[in-house]
C-alpha cells in the first residue's frame, strides 16, 4: 500500500483521538438540553472522576450548582448532599440568598440535635434544678414547686416584628428544606426591625423565577400585586 493510500485513514484516526482527548470539546450531561446549557455557568460537563454523568444536571431545570458555587433563591438548585448557605456572620442571611450571594456547601445536621444530649447530662458535683426546688419546697412548704425560669421566649416574641415571628415559624417547620429548593417555597423577607419588606417573593423553581408581590410593613398585600413574574416595582410608601 502506497503512502498516499495510508494518509486518509491516518487523518481519520488523528481526528478521532483529538475528539476523545481531555482538551477536546466538553461532553454534555444527559438531560441538559442545548437551550438549558446556555444558562449554566461553565457549561454542562461530565465529572472526570467517573461519577454519574447526570450528577451536575437536573432533569428539566438546568444544571445543579456544585460545591463552592454561588447560589440563591433564584438560581438552580445545589447538587444532592449540598445546601445553599448564606455568607457566615451575614446580618441579613435571607437577603443574601435572595441576591444569590450564598454558597453550595455540604448539608449539616440541625444544631438542636447536637445540643440536647449535652443539656440533658448535668456535670458531676452540680445540682439539678428540680432537686434544688424540691429542697426549697421542704424548707418552705408555702412556696411553689414549679421551677422559676425567665420567660425569655415570651420577651423575644413581644419584641419581634410580625415578619420575624412569621419567619421563625417557617424555619421551624421547614428547617433545612428552606435552602434545598426542591419545591416553590415562601420565606418572608424581613427588614432589620422584624417587619416585612415591601417586596415579597416565592422561591424559584429551576431557572424559572417565582412570583413577587408588594406588601406593607405588617405583611398585608397592596393593590396591584402580585404581577406573576416578579418584574414590577413596589411603591416606596411601604417598608423595605
UniProtKB/Swiss-Prot annotation:
Signal peptide stretch: 1-27
Region described as Disordered: spans on this chain: 109-160, 217-240
GO cellular component terms, semicolon-separated: extracellular region; extracellular space; insulin-like growth factor binary complex
Record has Transit peptide as a keyword: no
Limits of the Thyroglobulin type-1 domain: 160-234
InterPro entries found in the cross-reference section: Growth_fac_rcpt_cys_sf (IPR009030), IGFBP-6 (IPR022326), IGFBP-like (IPR000867), IGFBP_1-6_chordata (IPR022321), Thyroglobulin_1 (IPR000716), Thyroglobulin_1_sf (IPR036857)
Glycosylation sites: 126, 144-146, 152
Keyword list, A-Z: Disulfide bond, Glycoprotein, Growth factor binding, Secreted, Signal
Modifications made to the protein after synthesis: O-linked glycans consist of hexose (probably Gal), N-acetylhexosamine (probably GalNAc) and sialic acid residues. O-glycosylated with core 1 or possibly core 8 glycans. O-glycosylated on one site only in the region AA 143-168 in cerebrospinal fluid.
Quaternary structure and partners: Interacts (via C-terminal domain) with PHB2.
Name of the protein in its database record: Insulin-like growth factor-binding protein 6
Species this chain originates from: Homo sapiens (Human)
Source species taxonomy: Eukaryota, Metazoa, Chordata, Craniata, Vertebrata
Annotated gene: IGFBP6
